[in-house]
Regions:
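Coil-to-beta-strand transition motifs
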Residues: 98-100, 107-109, 152, 164-166
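Conserved catalytic cores of phosphodiester-cleaving nucleases, focusing on short active-site segments
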Residues: 101-127
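Metal-dependent nuclease catalytic cores that hydrolyze phosphodiester bonds in DNA/RNA
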Residues: 1-100, 206-210
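Secondary-structure boundary elements
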Residues: 70-76, 107-113, 146-153
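Short histidine-centered catalytic/ligand-binding loop motif
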Residues: 46-49, 123-133
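Residue-level signal for well-ordered alpha-helical scaffold segments within enzymatic catalytic domains
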Residues: 2, 6, 110, 140-143, ...
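Metal-dependent nuclease catalytic regions and adjoining charged, substrate-binding loops involved
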Residues: 128-135, 140-220
Length: 220
């Protein structure tokens, strides 16, 4: 929210100083401190509570984005955090899959997502991008939005560091990567249909081995 809708941030979050803990040398998990924190949250209308360091980090990220012209181009104006439902979106007479997406933001010709990451730099985020299947996610988001009649020509990610110094970077996703992501989600959806219909018992892939070779799924 600090990134997408900073004007609403204060309405949903507040901060409490560690010095306010009844038991100073204990964490907030200690019963006395936990009870105090829950009471403060109730007094603040159920807002989410952030530590002072978390609150300052959010403020820093917001300030930096305000000074980044790419943020103004991408985020303002844009539709933010809206859900789209597509019933019977994939499948045939043998079975269908319903789809729900919730893109962080989009506008005419642009789809975008915000990702918290340990490594917002190009080398580090490249690894995380494929590890967590962001190519699959964004390819699916783009197709559903297009099915809703939205023109999406450019797909981008805002990668925000989740640790000091909380740097950020914008990345445009190439078309060939999105097409590969589409192949992956189509394959995944086809597997879901097969498993739902009982046409496949291969629910865990082609094999699995844990770190200690304790269990191996045999394929005959």
């Amino acid at each position: 929210m600090a990134v997408l809708e900073p004007e609403l941030f204060e309405q949903h979050y507040f901060t409490i100083d560690d010095d306010k803990k009844p038991v100073k040398d204990a964490t907030w998990a200690k019963s006395e401190n936990k009870a105090y924190k829950e009471a403060v949250i109730a007094d603040n209308g159920g807002k989410d509570c952030l530590s002072v360091s978390e609150y300052k980090a959010c403020a820093l990220v917001t300030k930096r984005l305000k000074n980044d012209f790419r943020g103004h181009i991408s985020l303002e104006p844009a539709v933010k955090e809206s859900s789209f439902y597509a019933d019977d979106w994939y499948g045939d007479e043998d079975g269908v899959v319903n789809v729900k997406i919730r893109p962080d933001f989009f506008k005419p010709n642009l789809l975008g997502d915000v990702k918290s990451t340990k490594s917002p730099d190009p080398k580090g985020f490249y690894w995380e991008f494929f590890k967590y299947g962001y190519d699959i996610q964004l390819a699916l988001y783009r197709q559903v939005l297009r099915d809703y009649g939205h023109t999406i020509d450019k797909t981008t990610i805002l990668a925000v560091g989740n640790g000091a110094p909380y740097c950020h970077e914008w990345y445009t996703i190439p078309e060939d990567i999105l097409e590969k992501g589409k192949e992956k989600y189509l394959y995944g959806l086809s597997r879901i249909v097969q498993i739902k219909n009982g046409n496949s018992s291969d629910k865990y892939g082609i094999g699995f081995r844990d770190e200690d070779d304790f269990i191996i799924l045999d394929r005959y």
